[in-house]
UniProtKB/Swiss-Prot annotation:
Its main location: cytoplasm. It comes from Persephonella marina (strain DSM 14350 / EX-H1). Coiled coil: none annotated. The active site is at E205, K337. This is Enolase. It is an enzyme of class 4 (lyase).
Amino acid sequence: MSVIVDIRGREVLDSRGNPTVEAEVVLESGVVATALVPSGASTGETEAVELRDGDKNRFKGKGVLKAVDNINTKIADLLIGENALDQVRIDRLMLELDGTENKSNLGANAILAVSLAVARAAAMELDIPLYRYLGGTNAKVLPVPLMNVINGGAHADNNLDFQEFMIVPVFGGRFKEALRCGVEIFHTLKTVLKDKGYSTNVGDEGGFAPALNSTKEALDILMDAIKKAGYEPGEDVLLAIDAASTEFYDKERKVYRFEGEELTADDMIVLYEEIEGTYPIISIEDGLAEDDIEGWKKLTKALGDKIQLVGDDLFTTNPKLIKKGIEEGIANSVLVKLNQIGSLTETLDAIELAKVASYTNVISHRSGETEDTFIADLAVATNAGQIKTGSASRTDRIAKYNQLLRIEEELGEDAVFKGKEAYSKFIR
């Protein structure tokens, strides 16, 4: 009854109004499951290829009819008759059919949509929650949310070079209490920004994008909002930054164009040490450019035992790159984005590889999201302990938080929320 009898692809829209792919998988039992894939704004050079049509007369070239057609023809022909319960085989068949290193033939968006829809169909067929199907009986850890409340860089039209300033609520002993803490700070932040005369329009990920002029100003405003919301920085709430530094790195001259200056990797490391010493920063993502491997080695040596150093563009959820990074001793954490690698099996391989090496995992959304909540289940399934899924506004972000609330309720007394303990290897 778990045999796949039909697969359909369709072109739908993401949270930025750009086309994306939805896949629908039908099983012999009558189960119908769908999955939608997201899209990023700042992308690593080694990410799997998101197949776009390039027809400037449709959606300014961003249509995905080619990827949809690949689902409706090549992938459907390949997988109809296969068992949805054999996820590894399903994904392997698609990867073999594609035949490229970066999935440029079928498109990572086509492969991933089908991969996720098959997993969801299998869970429905077995009548168990998706997180339980993916993670087994020990899937029970609710993630600490890293909430992007101030946007800069490629996510905003302001003077902030760093892309994301996040609050990390570790308060309350339960996910729902930590989320409440984060939401209350978000609303307080809005008031703080208004009182200072700043705009409170929200960006792609639901955070504010005020015309702030420096990293220090952004962090000071966050500290103020945390205190005014009634919480203690460093105890109830930690801070995190996504520098997305590849975006302001001059590859030729090997300098970072940051806040009007040209800085070396050593200068950036000094900057991070100063920030970490002044504010309750627990995590820095993409602190240096994906090509600056020597810089990454120095950064890891300087701060790797004090804070979480997350590789996003550095690793692009690619097991081969993660393995190489582990061998070189760079970073200590992996940002996990399903569409960077383009299949569920490879994503789970990446997560496991990081765990074995004692690297932390942060499950992540993309800036162009959908209403699909797969990453919420993935976070619990893998006991990752952390999730990045935006601020406390925009339905595409809130959908993931709401799914996590449901999962925590369903798990009842078995649910685990580690809070500050999620960072025990860094907090002495």
